[in-house]
Amino acid sequence: MNPALPEDVKTLLTDLETFISDVLKGETLSKKAKEKKEVLIKRLKDIKHSHSLEFQAETDDLEENDGFPLPPDAVSIASDRDKDEELPYDGSFYPLVAAQDLEYLRAGYLEKRRKDHSFFASEWQKRWCVCTNSMFYYYGSDKDKQQKGAFSLDGYRAKMNDTLRKDAKKDCCFEIFAPDKRVYQFAASSPKEAEEWVNIIMNSRGNIPTEDEELYDDVNQEVDASHEEDIYEELPEESEKPVTEIETPKATPVPVNNTSGKENTDYANFYRGLWDCTGDHPDELSFKHGDTIYILSKEYNTYGWWVGEMKGTIGLVPKAYIMEMYDI
C-alpha cells in the first residue's frame, strides 16, 4: 500500500497538471519541449493511478477526457479547490443565489486578485462580479447558479490603486477595504470602468434609499407652531377671496360729497386707497391711490376682504390696500 501523499504535494501536482493542460495548451512548443511535456503527463498520470483513492475524482475525469480535465474557467487556474480563498473573512456565510437572480447596481467581468496563489496558479482570476445595494458577489461566470464568494459592503470603502500590477492594467486596479477586514482587489478592463466600479461601491453602502425606502415626512411628528404659522401665513395678494355672492344693499350708500348730517356719523366707514388696485374679477372693485371708498360691510373680514362702494360701483375691496380716511 502506497503511503498517503502530503497535502502540499497533492496541491503541487494539481497545479502542475493545470499548468501543462491549460497554460501550455496555447503555447507554441519546440519538439524537445513537446517530448518533455508528454513525459510529465505520463508521470503525473502514473502517480494519480498509484494513489487512486486520493485522486478518485481526478482519475475519473482523466478517463473521460483522455488525460487531464480542463478547468471551467481558463483564467481561474486550479483555484476552485482552494476553499479558504473564497470564504468570507468574518466567517459569515450567505445564502447561495444564482447570478441571474440578483437585482444589481452594476455587474460585469473583473479580474480578482487571489489572496494566496502558488507558482503555477494565476494570481488574478476572471470573475463575474455583481454589486447590489448592500452586497458584493463574485461568480465564475454570469451563468453560475451559486456564487464563489460574497461579502457585505457594510463598512467597506473603495479606491483606485495603481500599485497592484505592473503591466498594461496598472491604472485599471481598485480595491475594496475596511478596517480589520479582508481587502478585496480587482482589475477592470479600463481605468474608466474601474472608476465607475469605485463610484458604484461608494454609493451602495446603504447611503442611498432604494425605491421602496423613499424618505417621507413623519405624519406623527409634531410641527413647531410658530414654524407652521410662518408657512401658512396669508399675504394680502394671496388671500383667498370669498366665494359667497354679494347681495347689493337695497339702501343707497352715502355719497362721498354728501354734506348731510349722516356724513358726520359715518366717518369711520370712509377709507382711501393706499395703492392702485385692479380687480381680477367682475365682483372686485378697482381703485387708485387716494380714491375714497365707502365701506358697506365687513362680513368677509376673515378672508381679508370688505364690501365697498366708489362712485356708484360696489365690489370686494382687499382691506390691506386701504386705510381710514379720518382719524376719529
From Swiss-Prot:
Keywords: B-cell activation, Cytoplasm, Phosphoprotein, SH3 domain. Residues 231-262 are annotated as: Disordered. The keyword Cytoplasm applies. Pfam families: PH, SH3_1. GO terms for biological process: B cell activation. It is found in: Cytoplasm. PROSITE patterns: PH_DOMAIN (PS50003), SH3 (PS50002). Phosphorylated on tyrosines. Residues 238-248 have a biased composition (Basic and acidic residues). One of its GO terms (cellular component) is cytoplasm. InterPro entries: PH-like_dom_sf, PH_domain, SH3-like_dom_sf, SH3_domain, SKAP_fam. Residues 266-327 form the SH3 domain. Its main location: cytoplasm. Coiled coil: none annotated. Residues 103-206 form the PH domain. It comes from the Eukaryota. May be involved in B-cell and macrophage adhesion processes. May play a role in src signaling pathway. Belongs to the SKAP family. This is Src kinase-associated phosphoprotein 2. It comes from Xenopus tropicalis (Western clawed frog).
